[in-house]
From Swiss-Prot:
Alphabetic keyword roster: Activator, DNA-binding, Early protein, Host cytoplasm, Host nucleus, Host-virus interaction, Inhibition of host innate immune response by virus, Metal-binding, Modulation of host cell apoptosis by virus, Transcription, Transcription regulation, Viral immunoevasion, Zinc, Zinc-finger
Stated name of the protein: Protein E6
Alphabetical list of InterPro entries matching this protein: E6, E6_sf
Other known facts: Belongs to the low risk human alphapapillomavirus family. The cancer-causing human papillomavirus E6 protein has a unique carboxy terminal PDZ domain containing substrate but low risk E6s do not possess this domain.
Homology family: Belongs to the papillomaviridae E6 protein family.
Lineage: Viruses, Monodnaviria, Shotokuvirae, Cossaviricota, Papovaviricetes
Compartments in which it is found: Host cytoplasm; Host nucleus
Zinc finger (unnamed): 29-65, 102-138
Biological processes, Gene Ontology terms: DNA-templated transcription; regulation of DNA-templated transcription; symbiont-mediated perturbation of host apoptosis; symbiont-mediated perturbation of host ubiquitin-like protein modification; symbiont-mediated suppression of host innate immune response; symbiont-mediated suppression of host type I interferon-mediated signaling pathway
GO cellular component labels: host cell cytoplasm; host cell nucleus
SUPFAM superfamilies: E6 C-terminal domain-like
One of the record's GO molecular function terms: DNA binding
Record's subunit section: Forms homodimers. Interacts with ubiquitin-protein ligase UBE3A/E6-AP; this interaction stimulates UBE3A ubiquitin activity. Interacts with host TP53 and EP300; this interaction inhibits TP53 activity.
Amino acid sequence: MSEENPCPRNIFLLCREYGLELEDLRILCVYCKRPLSDADVLAFAVKELFVVWRKGFPYGACEKCLIAAAKLRQYRHWHYSCYGDTVETETGIPIPQLFMRCYICHKPLCWEEKEALLVGNKRFHKISGQWTGHCMNCAPRCMENAPALRTSH
């Protein structure tokens, strides 16, 4: 490792530091200690999550553990929920300029996802002191809570 950056903070820097291709990286989950699958490594990288260092070894997080950790974080550290105008008033920063993650999968929200939350009059959630929302992938589906259709023949 280089002296100026002894512990790479993300998957891409870790690969560069050790001369590895992303698909060749083998890393364990910080929670369950199992090896991350190729899909888990890619998802961890795309979500721009930080590598955790323990006793000189890097760890990531598998998808299953990330979802469980997110749910636990919601239960333990949820402060309150409010609409976008309240978030902007509280922070003094327009929603599109705020860094936010999905409170379900941890993916950084893009401006289209933030805009969809604003236009849809959906709430943002303050969890562990950070403003969060849900990404398009984790958004409730429009028919998810609809009553089942009965068909007659």
